[in-house]
């Protein structure tokens, strides 16, 4: 199979530009559902006391870069958990989890790659296919990080993405530390923008599969090494 085409951070620049006028319909509905279920918002004052050690459905963190992309997206979700290693920056959190990806997730990716190659979509490889000898501090925007391209990174949030002819996906790993620094809530948000009917068709099986994969990856952030 062909190797994934290289991407640069610039290729996603339009996705990271806030819309001129946000339309809060889907996100408002999602926020309302979260409040009704009693889920703590990632940036709430009681986050560190209320957050569980199992993933909970939440919202894109207020003020995060990924929040700019939620409105108008075809699909988005967010999952939060109290981090087992609160001192790790967001990219290090992602790398730790990716390097220990469960076999069933990599197996699902191999199946996905075989099937989508029949309709001309990219082989992304496996989620665990990250450079084991490369530290988070060595990555620069535009570098490949497993199946994603690194778009931006900071002490509070890392954005990873990929683009193909059918859709664009951006994943955020956001860390909110307590004042003392001994606790942190990590929120993983996924935003998908589809380009055409193929993207919508692709999302039919991917949407439910993503639910299980996202929860498993976020759960790993809450589990110790």
Question: Which role does the model predict for each range below?
Answer:
Residues 48-131:
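Hydrophobic ligand-binding cavity/cleft-lining segments
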Residues 202-225:
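A conserved amphipathic terminal alpha-helix motif
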């Amino acid at each position: 199979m062909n190797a994934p085409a290289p991407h640069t951070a610039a290729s996603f620049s339009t996705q990271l530009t806030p819309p001129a006028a946000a339309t809060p319909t889907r996100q408002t509905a999602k926020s309302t559902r979260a409040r009704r279920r009693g889920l703590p918002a990632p940036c709430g004052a009681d986050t560190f006391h209320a957050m569980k050690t199992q993933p909970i459905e939440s919202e894109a963190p207020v003020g995060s870069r990924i929040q700019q992309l939620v409105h108008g997206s075809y699909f988005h979700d967010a999952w939060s958990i109290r981090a087992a290693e609160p001192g790790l920056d967001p990219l290090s959190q992602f790398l730790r989890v990716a390097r220990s990806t469960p076999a069933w997730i990599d197996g699902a990716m191999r199946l996905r790659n075989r099937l989508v190659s029949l309709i001309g979509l990219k082989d992304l490889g496996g989620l665990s296919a990250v450079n084991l000898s490369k530290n988070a501090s060595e990555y620069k925007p535009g570098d490949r990080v497993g199946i994603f391209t690194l778009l931006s990174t900071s002490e509070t949030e890392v954005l990873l993405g990929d683009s193909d002819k059918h859709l664009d996906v951006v994943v955020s790993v956001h860390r909110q530390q307590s004042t003392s620094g001994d606790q942190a809530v990590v929120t993983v948000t996924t935003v998908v923008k589809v380009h055409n009917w193929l993207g919508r068709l692709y999302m039919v099986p991917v949407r439910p599969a993503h639910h299980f994969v996202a929860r498993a990856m976020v759960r790993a952030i809450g589990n110790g090494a």
